[in-house]
């Protein structure tokens, strides 16, 4: 049974490689400000919005490498928000695979406005079978 389980996990991650990257982008609008998201009272990019963009980049970095019926879910994110961004700024989040351990995939993530680093951190995703994952919700 253990060998079958290991084989299934290996199949889930066999096409994911260290260094695999994706960049996700957004323009700061009122909808993603700290005011709108309830994380602050300033009209600047909300930290949760920056982290969501980083998570999106990580998810998309490996999405096409996953077998049919599988997806990845976020398990942990740690980040520092270093600089503010105003409405109208164009933000890019880059996620790069740094480690693969069974069904766990770790990423280095960073967000930029042009060449300016806005935030950086790490993110962990788990590869799951969609149907099995949803069945656990009861």
Feature names for model-found ranges:
Residues 1-11:
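N-terminal amphipathic/basic-hydrophobic helices that include classical n-h-c signal peptides
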